[in-house]
C-alpha cells in the first residue's frame, strides 16, 4: 500500500493532479468558515442543532451548515436535482428521454439542465433554511430579519453552491477522481474530529464511572472494523459470468476460457444512500417555510430517518434507488448486444434475448444483496443512538463510512489507472 502511494508521487502528471485537488479542497474548507452576511454564527454555540437530515448535510458540507457559512447549502441541491432529472428521463419528459439516448451530446444537455435546476433549488432551499434555523434559534441567527436580509442570504448561499459545483468540475477535469464525490469525501473527514470530541464529552466528561463509556468505545471500534471490512468486501465483490468466443474454441488452452463478464454485487456503489437522504430534503424544503404549522412539523418528523416511520421510508428508498441506479450503471440489453457483436456468448445461454434475460436475472439477485447491505449499514448507527445512548452525530456514521470507503476505492483505482497508463506510454515510447 505504501509503495502504491509512493508511485503516485513519482509520476509528475499524477502528482500535479493530487496537489491541484488538495488546493481546491483547501479553498473549500476555508469557505466553510466564512459566515453568510447578516447572520450570527455564534447562535449555534449553545444549541445542538437539528438532527437527522440536517446532521448529514452538515457532515457532507464539512461543518459549513453549523457555521452557516457561504457553503451552508453544500452540493445537496445538485444531488437532489440529479435524482429528479434521472426520474424525468424515464419517459416522463420525452425531450429528456431523447437526450439520454444521444450519447455525449445529450448528456451535456442534461448536465446543463441539471445545473440550472440545482441553482433554482438551492435558492428556494436557502430561503427556507434561513427561516427554519432562525425560528429554531428563536430569532438569534438573522441579525436583521427583513425580506432583504433573507434575499441576500439566499443569493449568497446559492452562489456558494454554484461555486462548489464549479470547484467539483475543476477537480474532475484537472484533479483526481469525481469532483463532487471528492468534496463530499473531504467534508466528511473534516468533521470527524468534532464528532470524536462530542462523543468524548458525552461519554467521559463529568462521569464518575466510565466503565460503560469504555464498553461503548470498544463496541464502536469493533463495529467500525466489521462495517469497514463488510463495506470493502461488498463494494469490491463481483460475480464473474464466464463467456466464450465462438471463433476461438481451439485456443481455450491459451486462456480464452478464463474470459468473464464482471458484475458487481453492488453496481450502484454508495449513490443510493446519498440519493435516499437527499430525497428527504424535498418535503422538508416546503416545511421550512411553515416552521410553526402542525402539519409541517408532522412532515418534518416523518421525513427524518431517525424517526420510526422515517427509518422504514429510508430503508425502502435505499433499496429502490439501489435497483434504479444499478440498472442505470449496467444495461443488460446493451451488454447482450455487445457480446453478440463480439462473437461471444455465455455458455449454455443463447445469444440475444436469452442472454439479456440471464444478465438481468443475475443483476436482480446481486442488487438485492447489495441493497440490503447498504440499508443495514445506514440503519445500524441510527439504532445505536436509540438504544446505546450514543451521540446523535453517530447517526450519520454508517452513511459517512460507506461514502468514504466508496470514494477512496474509486479514487485509488483512478490513480492506479493513470500511473499504469503513464508507465505504458513510457514503455511504448508513445
Swiss-Prot record:
Q: List the NCBIfam families.
A: 3a0501s007
Family assignment from sequence similarity: Belongs to the SecY/SEC61-alpha family.
Protein's cellular compartments: Cell membrane
* GO (cellular component) term, any one: plasma membrane
Q: Which SUPFAM superfamilies match?
A: Preprotein translocase SecY subunit
> In Gene Ontology terms, what is a biological process of this protein?
protein transport by the Sec complex
Cystine pairs: none
Supply the name of the protein.
Protein translocase subunit SecY
Q: Name one Pfam family in it.
A: SecY
Indicate yes or no for the key word RNA-binding.
no
Q: Which residues form a coiled coil?
A: none
Q: Which organism is it from?
A: Staphylococcus carnosus (strain TM300)
Provide the assembly information: Component of the Sec protein translocase complex. Heterotrimer consisting of SecY, SecE and SecG subunits. The heterotrimers can form oligomers, although 1 heterotrimer is thought to be able to translocate proteins. Interacts with the ribosome. Interacts with SecDF, and other proteins may be involved. Interacts with SecA.
Q: How does it sit in the membrane?
A: Multi-pass membrane protein
What residue intervals traverse the membrane?
A: 18-38, 68-88, 117-137, 148-168, 179-199, 215-235, 270-290, 308-328, 368-388, 390-410
Q: What is the lineage of its organism?
A: Bacteria, Bacillati, Bacillota, Bacilli, Bacillales
Keyword annotations: Cell membrane, Membrane, Protein transport, Translocation, Transmembrane, Transmembrane helix, Transport
What is the role of the protein in this entry?
Answer: The central subunit of the protein translocation channel SecYEG. Consists of two halves formed by TMs 1-5 and 6-10. These two domains form a lateral gate at the front which open onto the bilayer between TMs 2 and 7, and are clamped together by SecE at the back. The channel is closed by both a pore ring composed of hydrophobic SecY resides and a short helix (helix 2A) on the extracellular side of the membrane which forms a plug. The plug probably moves laterally to allow the channel to open. The ring and the pore may move independently.
- Kindly indicate whether the keyword Transmembrane belongs to this entry: yes
Amino acid at each position: 500500500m505504501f509503495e502504491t502511494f509512493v508511485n503516485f508521487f513519482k509520476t509528475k502528471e499524477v502528482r500535479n493532479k493530487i496537489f491541484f485537488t488538495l488546493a481546491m479542497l483547501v479553498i473549500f474548507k476555508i469557505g466553510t468558515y466564512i459566515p453568510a452576511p447578516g447572520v450570527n454564527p455564534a447562535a449555534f454555540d449553545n444549541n445542538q442543532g437539528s438532527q437527522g437530515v440536517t446532521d448529514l448535510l452538515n457532515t457532507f458540507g464539512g461543518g459549513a451548515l453549523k457555521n452557516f457559512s457561504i457553503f451552508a447549502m453544500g452540493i445537496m441541491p445538485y444531488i437532489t436535482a440529479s435524482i429528479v432529472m434521472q426520474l424525468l428521463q424515464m419517459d416522463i419528459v420525452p425531450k429528456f428521454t431523447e437526450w439520454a439516448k444521444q450519447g455525449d451530446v445529450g448528456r451535456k444537455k442534461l448536465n446543463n439542465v441539471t445545473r440550472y435546476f440545482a441553482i433554482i433549488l438551492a435558492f428556494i432551499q436557502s430561503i427556507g433554511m434561513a427561516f427554519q434555523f432562525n425560528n429554531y434559534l428563536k430569532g438569534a441567527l438573522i441579525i436583521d430579519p427583513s425580506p432583504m436580509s433573507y434575499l441576500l442570504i439566499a443569493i449568497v448561499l446559492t452562489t456558494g453552491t454554484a461555486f462548489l459545483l464549479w470547484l467539483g468540475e475543476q477537480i474532475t477535469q484537472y484533479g483526481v477522481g469525481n469532483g463532487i464525490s471528492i468534496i463530499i469525501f473531504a467534508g466528511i473527514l473534516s468533521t470527524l474530529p468534532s464528532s470524536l470530541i462530542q462523543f468524548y464529552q458525552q461519554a467521559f466528561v463529568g462521569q464518575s464511572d466510565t466503565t460503560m463509556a469504555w464498553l461503548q468505545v470498544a463496541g464502536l471500534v469493533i463495529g467500525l472494523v466489521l462495517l469497514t471490512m463488510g463495506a470493502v468486501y461488498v463494494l469490491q465483490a463481483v460475480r464473474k459470468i464466464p463467456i466464450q468466443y465462438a471463433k476461438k474454441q481451439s485456443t481455450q488452452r491459451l486462456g480464452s476460457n478464463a474470459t468473464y463478464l464482471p458484475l458487481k454485487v453492488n453496481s450502484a456503489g454508495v449513490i443510493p444512500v446519498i440519493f435516499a437522504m437527499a430525497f428527504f430534503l424535498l418535503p422538508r424544503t416546503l416545511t421550512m417555510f411553515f416552521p410553526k404549522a402542525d402539519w409541517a412539523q408532522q412532515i418534518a418528523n416523518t421525513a427524518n430517518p431517525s424517526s420510526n416511520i422515517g427509518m422504514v421510508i429510508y430503508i425502502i428508498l435505499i433499496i429502490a434507488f439501489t435497483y434504479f441506479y444499478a440498472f442505470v450503471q449496467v444495461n443488460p440489453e446493451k451488454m447482450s448486444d455487445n457480446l453478440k457483436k463480439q462473437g461471444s456468448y455465455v455458455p449454455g445461454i443463447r445469444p440475444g434475448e436469452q442472454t439479456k434475460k440471464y444478465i438481468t436475472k443475475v443483476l436482480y439477485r446481486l442488487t438485492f444483496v447489495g441493497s440490503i447491505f447498504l440499508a443495514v449499514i445506514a440503519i445500524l448507527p441510527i439504532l445505536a443512538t436509540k438504544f446505546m445512548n450514543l451521540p446523535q452525530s453517530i447517526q450519520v456514521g454508517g452513511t459517512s463510512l460507506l461514502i468514504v470507503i466508496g470514494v477512496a476505492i474509486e479514487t485509488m483505482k483512478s490513480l492506479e489507472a493513470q500511473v499504469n497508463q503513464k508507465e505504458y506510454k513510457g514503455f511504448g515510447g508513445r
